[in-house]
A protein has these predicted regions:
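N- or domain-start disorder-to-order transition segments that initiate the globular core
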Residues: 1-6
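Structural motif
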Residues: 8-9, 25-28, 48-51, 66-70, ...
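Residues that scaffold, gate, or flank divalent-cation-dependent active/transport sites
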Residues: 10-21, 35-44, 57-100, 104, ...
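Active/ligand-binding-proximal structured segments within catalytic/core domains
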Residues: 26-38
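A short glycine-rich beta-strand->turn/loop micro-motif centered on a GG-aromatic cluster
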Residues: 52-56
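Long, charged alpha-helical interface segments
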Residues: 82-119, 133, 138, 155-181
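Short, structured patches in soluble enzyme cores that scaffold and shape functional sites
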Residues: 104-105, 124, 146-148
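Phosphate/ribose-phosphate-bearing ligand recognition and processing surfaces
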Residues: 147-157
Length: 181
């Protein structure tokens, strides 16, 4: 570890976040199968804004204000929602130029938990290089939070976290004290 290096850590479940929480760190949210991949897809398809909201009540209030809403719980699309949380729902024809409020079982909850961090970054395999480039230019430590499934470990989120950590460590600007990385 050099003086100019930044620390990178991985939180394998939101349930463990309180043990790692660091308001001066940049927190990377990872929910590979749904939330973060869907948000990346939405921006690739021209959405003007995605607002991650932790509760269904909040999502419904955005619906009443005229926003499109993508919302699910336990994999079921909510009755009031325009569509669910699959990246395949975020097509250019559906969302280009629109504002979307987005609420999911796991991913948007993780975003909400990290809201007081220095910066919250949404990451998936779709934007891995862009996330690496962004974090490499920042001076803060990085905490990668796997959204998991209902507070439990998620293999796909962990796989992505490993890929990002590998890039960060190989770039030379980061170190880790964690023996599981």
């Amino acid at each position: 570890m050099r003086q100019d290096q930044k620390k990178v850590e991985v939180v394998f479940s939101p349930e463990m976040y309180r043990h790692f929480e660091n308001h001066q760190a940049n927190v990377v949210i990872v929910d590979i199968l749904r939330a973060t991949s869907a948000i990346c897809t939405a921006f690739m398809n021209g959405v003007s804004q995605v607002i991650p909201v932790p509760t269904l009540e909040e999502a419904q209030s955005y619906k009443q204000k005229g926003y499109m809403v993508a919302a699910e719980r336990d994999g079921r699309v909510m009755d009031f929602a325009d569509f669910g949380n699959s990246p395949f729902n975020f097509t250019k024809e559906r969302i280009q130029g629109k504002q979307v409020a987005y609420s999911t079982t796991n991913g948007t909850r993780a975003v909400h938990m990290a809201r007081n961090s220095k910066m919250v970054v949404i990451a998936s395999f779709l934007n891995l290089t862009a996330v690496y480039d962004l974090l490499s230019k920042k001076d803060e430590d990085v905490l990668i939070m796997c959204a998991g499934w209902k507070g439990k470990f998620s293999l796909e989120d962990t796989l992505f976290s490993g890929a990002l950590v590998e890039k960060l460590l190989a770039g030379g600007g980061f170190y880790t004290i964690c023996d599981s990385i």
